[in-house]
Amino acid sequence: IRSDLSEKVLAVGNSEYETTYTIVPTIMTVYRGYAWADIQIGITPVRFVTTHLESLWDENEIPNAAKQARQLIADLKDTKNPIVIMGDFNSDPRDPRIKDDPNAGGQPTASAACPGGTSVCNAYLLMREAGFKDVGPNALDPINNTWGMNALLTGPDPDRLKYSQQ
């Protein structure tokens, strides 16, 4: 934060998710977590949270991103101030993909552990069910992707502020 605004920072913190992903057992484990800051905006303190949920997943298992989203929701449940969460959720509203659905990105696929069309294995839907609002335009419309070539070619979404104020 800019030095002239440092007095607006009320508190900061971070946490590590309990769920990790081990690529090479005992040698390489991927740890993820989140950082937060309570910042005075006008007369209201607002908690800003940034995170990067796990992208890797194992077939017929609940993706770590969903487990991490559950922990994030639980960790924030007693926060009294407004909350803004941002980051890379590595989740798509269509996950887990039903067999034969387009899945060019290798997203989680439906299985006994992860039924399609539910939030059981979907970090995005878990956050929505917990009451968080997606301030971007329709996440199912590929034109609104905020990653990949579309974002690189077209730049930031000019309508994001408008959607957040609705």
Task: Kindly give the residue locations of the regions a language model identified.
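Structured beta-strand-rich core segments of catalytic domains in phosphoester-bond hydrolases
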Residues: I1-L53
